[in-house]
A protein has these predicted regions:
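Conserved catalytic submotifs in the C-terminal HATPase_c
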Residues: 4-8, 26, 31-40
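Short helix N-cap motif at coil->helix boundaries in the Bergerat
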Residues: 10, 91-102
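Short alpha-helical segment within the cytosolic histidine kinase core of two-component systems
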Residues: 15-27
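Short helix-loop "hinge" at the ATP-lid/N-box region of the Bergerat-fold HATPase_c
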Residues: 60-61
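Short beta-strand/loop element within the Bergerat-fold HATPase_c
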Residues: 67-79
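Acidic ATP/Mg2+-coordinating residue in the GHKL
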Residues: 87
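Conserved glycine-rich
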Residues: 133-134
Length: 155
């Protein structure tokens, strides 16, 4: 995996990704709320960071019941851009949390068959974020929802 770094604005990438996924969310009666506090200009691979946003938001749409809400927030905290993607979905059981970024790991095999996917999306997210010298973490309460936090250095 190689990066093509250039000066970019992370907020633009977030907005574009949300507009690409909005039709999918609307089909399920879901709302994607975008809260951008800072534009977050950075030297990074915009295509790869779009893939990070897409993979996490698409998962949120898949695992959030019809009528649910996905919130995408971006702010600059210190020297980092902090992107939070939260949903009101089914959540992830505590015992599965340490494994969500593992290749081919699926939290719920039965649910996976109906939602599709390969189990690679979040491992790709972690790989891309690490190549940008950032971190990605997950917090979840089973039955209440999940929040993924991506932290990336801003120049």
């Amino acid at each position: 995996l190689r990066l093509r770094r250039e000066m970019m604005v992370l907020a633009d990438t977030v907005r574009e990704t949300v507009s690409r996924l909005n039709p999918l969310a609307k089909k399920r009666g879901q709302q994607i709320v975008v809260k951008i506090q800072d534009e977050c200009e950075m030297f990074a691979d915009s295509g790869k960071l779009a893939q990070v946003c897409y993979n996490i938001i698409e998962n949120a749409i898949k695992y959030t019941p019809d009528g649910g809400t996905i919130t995408v927030s971006l702010a600059k905290v210190g020297r980092d851009a902090v992107l939070d993607i939260s949903d009101t979905g089914v959540g992830i059981p505590a015992e599965d949390l340490p494994h969500v970024f593992d290749r081919f790991y699926r939290v719920d095999k039965a649910r996976s068959r109906e939602t599709g996917g390969t189990g690679l999306g979040l491992s790709i997210v972690k790989q891309i974020v690490r190549l940008h010298a950032g971190t990605v973490t997950v917090a979840s309460e089973f039955g209440k929802g999940t929040t993924f936090t991506v932290q990336l250095p801003v120049k």
